[in-house]
Amino acid sequence: MSNGIQDIRKLSTYYPNLETLIHYVNYDTLLEEHKRQLSSKAVGVDGVTKKEYDSNIEENLTNLVKRMKTFSYRPRPVRRTYIPKANGKLRPLGIPSYEDKLVQGVMARILNEVYEPRFLDCSYGFRENRNAHQAITEVNQLIMYRKVNYVLDCDIKGFFDNVDHKWLMKFLEHDISDKNFLRYIVRFLKSGCMENGQLEESKKGTPQGGLISPVLANVYLHYVLDSWFTKHVLPTLKGEAYLVRFADDF
């Protein structure tokens, strides 16, 4: 990771609230994200492929940065499609435009650097050097070696589609005071969805198919579940209790 984004983690360790983040979304970081995206074959909702965007990359990114600085850049509504699930049902999937993927990709990297020092050890999903196998191992170790008699397995139904925007922004504002950076997060949250030619407003939930959605989900659950359990539940207990979370499964 280059272009200064790697410095955010150190800043986040020392400062409880970060004031300037939007400047990390610049030509260099967008170009770096574009190179990451080139290996994928997916086409954005606007029909633009990576190779098409790459053919005039300097002008395209210069124009994108200019629009972001003047706040004339607005994310497009994602196109909703459906993919089959293992149980035979269909899972909705959102396809964003290519430029939106670039901006979201950079903003997601920034958010991950902000929050990685702040997330608790009980969280395993969508985090650097953490995975489901580690979560399973941790659960196994707790059952085998700690004073655990009961296991409660929970899955938050429809979590990603029902995240409360107002509370999510409050959580972000607790750690980030860069209004311009937060403004673009709100725009992504409110960008809407196109299905069968009809625009559906986004009143709740994280962007479908968005690169920024996993870290936003982790921020939300960090406050409403992880921190709540650690700071408010554990001190009231006489025995032992542990939380192991992978995304919305815990």
What are these regions (language model features)?
Residues 105, 109-124:
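Electropositive, glycine- and tryptophan-enriched low-complexity nucleic-acid-binding patches
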Residues 102-107, 111, 216, 220:
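Solvent-exposed aromatic/hydrophobic patches embedded in short alpha-helical segments
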Residues 33-37, 106, 184-189:
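Short alpha-helical scaffolding segments that buttress acidic/His motifs in well-ordered protein cores
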Residues 67-68, 72-82, 86, 118-122, ...:
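Conserved polymerase palm-domain catalytic core
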Residues 92-97:
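Conserved phosphate-binding loops in nucleotide/dinucleotide-binding enzymes
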Residues 45, 98, 109, 154-156:
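Residues immediately flanking
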Residues 1-62:
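Non-catalytic, polymerase-adjacent accessory regions of viral genome-replication enzymes
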Residues 99, 103-106, 132, 150:
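Duplex nucleic acid-engaging cores and interfaces of nucleic-acid transaction enzymes
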